[in-house]
């Protein structure tokens, strides 16, 4: 509902047409970062980590607003994720992954610019950014065995649910 409501805002309409000012993009970065934070809190605790939908807000910010919006939203939501669990098993990896997901959403935006929103491209982007997140968890989280166990449990549901979430928005 929050995402649907965002579409009615003039700033989001400007973002979709490529006419948003720098200040409007900054404000929208905060909004999409807040959506990412909400995705963290709506997540489910799994093995000292959080299976979440943080990527939907962050990647969507990148898809709709480009790399600057995606990156900034990723820094906001990823920084929050790190700060709520400093020293946690996945704090660093999930924080880094969130920034990467925003940037990847922004890269897709560059491909879609001045074209209608493409749900299939958003679905593929969702799959790609979630795979990147799982890879970052495996690369940065320790102990490695715990990271493998976590990814084994959360990868499929997070890839499917978050990809569909991006596509239907």
Model segments located where?
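Short helix-perturbing small/polar motifs within transmembrane alpha-helices
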Residues: 1-40, 60-142, 166-167
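Non-cytosolic membrane-interface motifs at loop->transmembrane helix junctions
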Residues: 53-57, 90-93, 147-156
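Transmembrane helix-bundle signature of multi-pass membrane transporters/permeases
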Residues: 123-127, 154-159
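Membrane-water interface of alpha-helical transmembrane segments
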Residues: 19-26, 148, 152, 158
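Short helix-coil transition sites and intra-membrane helix breaks within transmembrane domains
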Residues: 46-51
């Amino acid at each position: 509902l929050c995402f649907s409501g965002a579409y009615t805002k003039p700033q989001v309409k400007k973002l979709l047409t490529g006419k948003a000012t720098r200040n409007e993009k900054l404000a929208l970065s905060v909004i999409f970062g807040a959506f990412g934070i909400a995705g963290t809190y709506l997540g489910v605790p799994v093995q000292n980590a959080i299976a979440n939908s943080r990527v939907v807000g962050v990647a969507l910010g990148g898809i709709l607003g480009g790399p600057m919006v995606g990156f900034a939203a990723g820094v906001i939501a990823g920084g929050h994720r790190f700060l709520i669990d400093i020293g946690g098993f996945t704090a660093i990896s999930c924080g880094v992954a969130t920034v990467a997901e925003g940037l990847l959403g922004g890269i897709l935006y560059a491909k879609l610019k001045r074209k209608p929103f493409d749900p299939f491209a958003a679905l593929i982007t969702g799959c790609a950014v979630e795979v990147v997140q799982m890879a970052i968890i495996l690369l940065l989280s320790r102990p490695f065995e715990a990271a493998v166990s976590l990814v084994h449990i959360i990868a499929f549901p997070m890839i499917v649910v978050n990809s569909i979430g991006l596509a239907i928005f």
